[in-house]
C-alpha cells in the first residue's frame, strides 16, 4: 500500500526545486522591522469621520463650508474602548477625506474644525484617547482634495507636505500613514510627488508603515473582505506602484504601461511563475479593508446593515488567518459616538477572537525542517476536541511554505487529512469545528528552501 505521506516536500517538492538560484532570490526578500511589527499586530480599525458624517454623504463635494460641520462634541474614549473590546490593536483616523475638510486646526487652510462649531482638535482628542488605553494611532490623509484651490498644480505638493508635517509632528508616534488612491473621474490630471511624501514620513516618523499608495502595505484588491487562496508577501516590486498609477489615482501613461499586466486585483501576485518574470521583488503584505456597515461613513439608514460578530469573525479568519492584516472600519455617528449596534458587534467579535487561543492543547516550535524531515508529529496525550490550528512562519527568514497538509490522528491510530492549504506566512488559522483526535501531523508538500516554522498551536 502506498504511504499517504510519501509525496512530501523532501521527495520532489511537488515538482519544484527546493533550492536553486531563483529560490535564493525569492527567500532573500525580507520584511522591514516596521513590517514585522505590523504582522505582530494584524488587526486594527478605521475611523471614517468628518464632514461626510455631518452631511450624511459617502463622498463630499468640496463646496461645503466649515459651518456645515454641525457636530459639536465627540466621545473618543467610547470609540477606543469599543475598538479595544474587539481585540484590535490600533486606530487609523480619516484626518482629511476627499472633500478637503481637516479634523485638526491646520495652519494652511481655513477649511477645518477651527472655523466650525466644534471646539477642539479632533485628531488630538483621538490620538490622546488611543494613548490612554495603549492603542496605536495612524492617520489617513487623502491626496485628492476637492476643496483646495492649488490642487492640480505643483503648489499642491507643498500644501500636502505641509499638512502631512503637521500630522506627523504634533500627535506623538504615528504607526501608519494611509494614502487613498481614489480620485474622481472629473478631477484634474495631476501626479502626486509620492517619493517626496515617503521621504518626509521616513524622516519624521521612521516607525510608520505607509499603506496602499505606499511601499509597505498593499491593498488586497477589494473592499468586501475577499482574499486569495494564496496571499503572498513576496511580490513583484512593480506592484508597489500599482495604486499610485491606477486609473483612479495618477494618470502617468509611462508608468501605467509598466503595470498593464499587474494590478492589486489580479488573482496571482506571488507564485513562482509570476516572480520568475519579475526582475525586482519586494516584501509587500496585503491589508484587507472592509466596513462594519454598508458604507464607510455613518448613515442612520444603514443601522440594519451592521455586520454581526459571526460575520466579522469570518472576515478575521479569512484575513488575519490567511497572512493578511485586517482593517475594519467603524464609523462614529453624527452624535460623536459609535452606534450601540456596532458596539455590540465589536464586543461579539472580540469574544470570538479570544476563544481561538483560550484553551491550548499543545503549542510547539518545530523550527527549521531539514531535507531529512518528512513530517512533524504532535502527541496530545489523550483524546481532545480540536477546534483551531494556528501556524506561523519566521517571516524574518522570508515566506517559504507554498503547500502543506495537516492530518489528525484518531484514537485507532489512523490519520485523516483535516486541511490541505497553500501558504502560511505570518499567520495561518485553520478552523476544524471540534474534531476528536489524539494527535496531529504537519506535512509540508512544497517550500522555497527549508521551511522555518517557529510556532504551531493546537486549541480546543
Which residue ranges define each predicted feature?
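Mature catalytic domains of secreted/periplasmic carbohydrate-active enzymes
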Residues: 2-411, 415-433, 443-459
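Short, conserved beta-strand segments of beta-strand-rich sandwich/propeller modules, principally
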Residues: 439-441
